């Protein structure tokens, strides 16, 4: 089977936005116009083609990024719909990693919102070119130029309109194209009757002003165009398009367009912009990787001629075909039924079948080429972030890094039957989502699940019930506290048991000191003259690592500590690895009195958006939750409060905010850093954990 679309005519794009900016609706319309859907599904009726998991339809938010393929004007457009809710940022990071370009959807009334900023930052990290689509132009309070202003103010991005709306709210009935100098008028709500006309007289002046600004902005990034512009020469439509494309693909410029996906206005023009301005796999830099043995850096170009290399970016469990592994092909060709090497794990895998996804239906294909996105059935050991490559030409593509979970809950199966199924369900779910962890607490025997926020864990429990038919009771959320040392000290650990028969003897002196934040635990051996034999030194390190897991104050993991073994003694007969392990853990316990241990708690960056009149109440509430207000600003007719609040104080905040603002306030939070807890709180935590 030969290639259906050339690499040049392929676009891999993501659609990213704040929750409720209308991202799923926009994707739906794209699928509708490219002939993939026969009936349009409305998100607020719960029938959207992209939101294919049951809970997504119920909550009206997108959770897993479904990868869909569509066709438009002789191009293949692969779309990854990414979630806009802050608890799912890992999904967004994961999809951005494999995209060549993205469409950032904004709500015309609110402009750039907190989650938009988070997603935008992630896209900048991965160097993803973007187009901005100002959606919901039909909504009350829609303001296109205000939205463009928020892109400059809040994202500091070089964004310029390449279109202007004709009218807004109920009056929104057309779009001015500044590049082609024409207008498109809509006569019906299905958006199928579009008339290309001259720019209406009353809009000409504004259009000229903004076209001038656009040309100036593009010319600043293109010397040749700058010369023409300064000499007063006419810049042709083709030259302007080429200039915008070049500046957009090099992530120096972001074109802004407008429309209303719900009213089917501007969607076809959005598709044209994707093809005109977002990069094909040939326009983005070759992917970098390393050779597994030597770690030497190499590049793989986007070409069918190169050896096969792909990155697995998502695992899903499908009720009909089992485990689906979504992957992006960076180079080469892959046929179904062939073998590949998972170079990250060093395992050989057989690709049973290759599927191309259309939101919730799928078609089986026999071959995928460079630049394609597809799903494989039959991979056993592959997880998110693994590289799949040709067995004869190994490479490891840079993998992705995921944040540690910040919140955990205990979960108990309701019956014996549920208990057996729960293990399977949890292992499948943690395979799909690297920020979700499940483990058994050694002391209590409880199963603990951990994730990125309350909504994240709610949805996991919900999926267990729906997909795996496991009923479970969920405990109160627990915060992932940590402990660390604030002072340095030299302490002794001595373990001696010599009562008849072979004894046990281990003796160490260890210097503990605080390490830099985020550096973790570092162990050094500074013993001179063999006072502790070489073979026992790893046991000292291992003994400390084991003991660190259960902390010294309240049983939370100890982090960011340096330990150096400086002295000790041993016994020819009675010393053993076990004895030195125990001696090391005794030294750690002895450090409590000397190293000033403290408890650390996760601090969340919280943004609350509220009407002005509730400002006082909300500020008071934030302070009562041990929060620090870090800034305020007016956003449209609302006030935004930015604060740093401990996670432990944020449980149930959604309910409190609703009642404080009669349901008119919204908030979002993301994990920011760990901070020392105040003494009074620390005492409470210690008491509670010791069961006093």
Swiss-Prot record:
InterPro entries: EFG_II, EFG_III, EFG_III/V, EFG_IV, EFG_V, EFG_V-like, EFTu-like_2, G_TR_CS. Signal peptide: none annotated. Its main location: cytoplasm. GO terms for biological process: ribosome disassembly. The keyword Cell inner membrane does not apply. GTP binds at residues 17-24, 81-85, 135-138. Keywords: Cytoplasm, Elongation factor, GTP-binding, Nucleotide-binding, Protein biosynthesis. It holds the Pfam family EFG_III. One of its GO terms (molecular function) is GTP binding. Gene3D superfamilies: 3.30.230.10, 3.30.70.240, Elongation Factor G (Translational Gtpase), domain 3, P-loop containing nucleotide triphosphate hydrolases, Translation factors. It is found in: Cytoplasm. GO terms for cellular component: cytoplasm. Residues 8-282 form the tr-type G domain. Belongs to the TRAFAC class translation factor GTPase superfamily. Classic translation factor GTPase family. EF-G/EF-2 subfamily. Catalyzes the GTP-dependent ribosomal translocation step during translation elongation. During this step, the ribosome changes from the pre-translocational (PRE) to the post-translocational (POST) state as the newly formed A-site-bound peptidyl-tRNA and P-site-bound deacylated tRNA move to the P and E sites, respectively. Catalyzes the coordinated movement of the two tRNA molecules, the mRNA and conformational changes in the ribosome. PANTHER family: RIBOSOME-RELEASING FACTOR 2, MITOCHONDRIAL, TRANSLATION ELONGATION FACTOR G-RELATED. This is Elongation factor G. It comes from Bacillus mycoides (strain KBAB4) (Bacillus weihenstephanensis).
């Amino acid at each position: 089977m030969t290639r259906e679309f050339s690499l040049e005519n392929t676009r891999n794009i993501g659609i990213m936005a704040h929750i409720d900016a209308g991202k799923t609706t926009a994707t739906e319309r794209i699928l509708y116009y490219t002939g993939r859907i026969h009936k349009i599904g409305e998100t607020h009726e719960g029938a959207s083609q992209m939101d294919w998991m049951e809970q997504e339809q119920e909550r009206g938010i997108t959770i897993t990024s479904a990868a869909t393929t569509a066709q438009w004007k002789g191009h293949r457009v692969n779309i990854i719909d990414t979630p806009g809710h802050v608890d799912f940022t890992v999904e967004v990071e994961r999809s951005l990693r494999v995209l060549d370009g993205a469409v950032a959807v904004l709500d015309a009334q609110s402009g750039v919102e907190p989650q938009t900023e988070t997603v935008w930052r992630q896209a900048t990290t991965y160097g993803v070119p973007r187009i901005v689509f100002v959606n919901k132009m039909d909504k009350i309070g829609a303001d296109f130029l205000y939205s463009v202003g928020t892109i400059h103010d809040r994202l500091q991005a070089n964004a310029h309109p390449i279109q202007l709306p004709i009218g807004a709210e109920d009056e929104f009935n057309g779009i001015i194209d500044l590049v082609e100098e024409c207008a498109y008028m809509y006569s019906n709500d299905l958006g199928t009757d579009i008339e290309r006309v001259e720019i209406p007289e009353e809009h000409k002046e504004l259009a000229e002003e903004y076209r001038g600004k656009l040309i100036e902005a593009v010319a600043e990034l293109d010397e040749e165009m700058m010369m023409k512009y300064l000499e007063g020469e006419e810049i042709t439509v083709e030259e302007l398009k080429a200039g915008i494309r070049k500046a957009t693909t090099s992530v120096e410029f972001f074109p802004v367009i407008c429309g209303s996906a719900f009213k089917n206005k501007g969607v076809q023009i959005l598709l044209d912009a994707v093809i005109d301005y977002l990069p094909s796999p040939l326009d983005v830099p070759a992917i970098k990787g390393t050779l597994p043995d030597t770690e030497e850096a190499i590049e793989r170009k986007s070409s069918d001629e190169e050896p096969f290399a792909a990155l697995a970016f998502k695992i899903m469990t499908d009720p009909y075909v089992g485990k689906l592994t979504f992957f992006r092909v960076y180079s080469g060709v892959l046929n179904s039924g062939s073998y590949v090497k998972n170079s990250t794990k060093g395992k050989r895998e057989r690709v049973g079948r290759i599927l191309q996804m259309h939101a919730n239906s799928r078609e089986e294909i026999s071959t995928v080429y460079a630049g394609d996105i597809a799903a494989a059935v039959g991979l056993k050991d592959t997880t998110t972030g693994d590289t799949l490559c040709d067995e004869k030409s190994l490479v490891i593509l840079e993998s992705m890094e995921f944040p540690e979970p910040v919140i955990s809950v205990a979960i108990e199966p309701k019956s014996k039957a549920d208990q057996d199924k729960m293990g399977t369900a949890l292992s499948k779910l943690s395979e799909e989502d690297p920020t979700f962890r499940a483990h058994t607490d050694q002391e209590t025997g409880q199963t603990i699940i951990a994730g990125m926020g309350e909504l994240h864990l709610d949805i996991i429990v919900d999926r267990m019930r729906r997909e795996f038919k496991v009923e479970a009771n969920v405990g109160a959320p627990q915060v992932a506290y940590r402990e660390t040392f604030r002072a340095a000290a030299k302490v002794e650990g001595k373990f001696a048991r010599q009562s008849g028969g072979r004894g046990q003897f281990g003796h160490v002196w260890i210097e503990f000191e605080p390490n830099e934040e985020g550096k973790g635990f570092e162990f050094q051996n500074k013993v001179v003259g063999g006072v502790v034999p070489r073979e026992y030194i790893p046991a000292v390190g291992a003994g400390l690592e084991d003991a660190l897991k259960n902390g010294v104050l309240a049983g939370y993991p100890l982090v960011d500590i340096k330990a150096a073994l400086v002295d000790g003694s041993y016994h020819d007969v009675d010393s053993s690895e076990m004895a030195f392990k125990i001696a090391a853990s005794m030294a750690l316990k002895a450090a409590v009195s000397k190293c000033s241990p403290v408890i650390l708690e996760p601090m969340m960056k919280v943004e609350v958006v509220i009407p002005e009149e509730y400002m006082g109440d909300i500020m008071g509430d934030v302070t009562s939750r041990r929060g620090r207000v870090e800034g305020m600003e007016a956003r449209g007719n609302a006030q935004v409060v930015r604060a740093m609040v401990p996670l432990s104080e944020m449980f149930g905040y959604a309910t409190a905010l609703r009642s404080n603002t009669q349901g008119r306030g919204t908030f979002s939070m993301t994990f920011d850093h760990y901070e020392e807890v105040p003494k009074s709180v620390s005492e409470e935590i210690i008491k509670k954990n010791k069961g006093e």
